[in-house]
Amino acid sequence: MATYYSNDFRAGLKIMLDGEPYAVEASEFVKPGKGQAFARVKLRRLLTGTRVEKTFKSTDSAEGADVVDMNLTYLYNDGEFWHFMNNETFEQLSADAKAIGDNAKWLLDQAECIVTLWNGQPISVTPPNFVELEIVDTDPGLKGDTAGTGGKPATLSTGAVVKVPLFVQIGEVIKVDTRSGEYVSRVK
């Protein structure tokens, strides 16, 4: 892989540090009046998702990570693994609970997901930004109860719990932002 110097770090770049892949989320190059220039970089560890801030001297470098993002279709969960398929080659790939993380509650059959591979193994799964799910349990709302900014918890068909407006009822389908886990709108 290519070698990147600290002044080449940009958001989205994937590099290797301490034998693990990291994604650059933000980078600020600083040239102080006195002393050597440096880069202040915010990184996300791809194996665990934890965020780290590091400082690199202008002469520091890092290897590019051999990480591939693939668009795959979610097929099913067998209890231990989540199975995905490449729509072009029909090749199937299995991801474990560590790679799925908290995203399992947003996975729907036939949903297009971004699966990140490192050394041919899935290390993270990103669901679609928005999903449409049915409400299976929530407190009943009262007619005309639309005032105020309050909400109520609602359990969705995948088991996820989302705060919804008071007028939303059981059986309705809602649109949810998977990045924040927030209610967006009702689906007609």
UniProtKB/Swiss-Prot annotation:
Coiled coil regions in record: none
Record has Cytoplasm as a keyword: yes
Main location: cytoplasm
Pathway: Protein biosynthesis; polypeptide chain elongation
Subcellular location as annotated: Cytoplasm
Consequences of knocking out this gene: Disruption of this gene leads to lethality or to a very slow growth phenotype. Required for the expression of poly-Pro-containing proteins.
PTM remark: Is beta-lysylated on the epsilon-amino group of Lys-34 by the combined action of EpmA and EpmB, and then hydroxylated on the C5 position of the same residue by EpmC. Lysylation is critical for the stimulatory effect of EF-P on peptide-bond formation. The lysylation moiety would extend toward the peptidyltransferase center and stabilize the terminal 3-CCA end of the tRNA. The hydroxylation of the C5 position on Lys-34 would allow additional potential stabilizing hydrogen-bond interactions with the P-tRNA.
GO biological process, one term: negative regulation of translational frameshifting
CC per GO annotation: cytoplasm; cytosol
Keyword flag Protein biosynthesis: yes
Keywords: Cytoplasm, Elongation factor, Hydroxylation, Protein biosynthesis
NCBIfam families in alphabetical order: efp (TIGR00038), PRK00529.1 (NF001810)
Function: Involved in peptide bond synthesis. Alleviates ribosome stalling that occurs when 3 or more consecutive Pro residues or the sequence PPG is present in a protein, possibly by augmenting the peptidyl transferase activity of the ribosome. Beta-lysylation at Lys-34 is required for alleviation. The Pro codons and their context do not affect activity; only consecutive Pro residues (not another amino acid) are affected by EF-P.
Assembly: Binds 30S, 50S and 70S ribosomes, possibly near the A site, note that T.thermophilus structures show binding between the P and E sites (PDB 3HUW and 3HUY). Proportionally less EF-P binds to larger polysomes, suggesting it has a role early in translation. It is present in 1 copy per 10 ribosomes.
Family: Belongs to the elongation factor P family.
Identification of the protein by name: Elongation factor P
Species for this entry: Escherichia coli (strain K12)
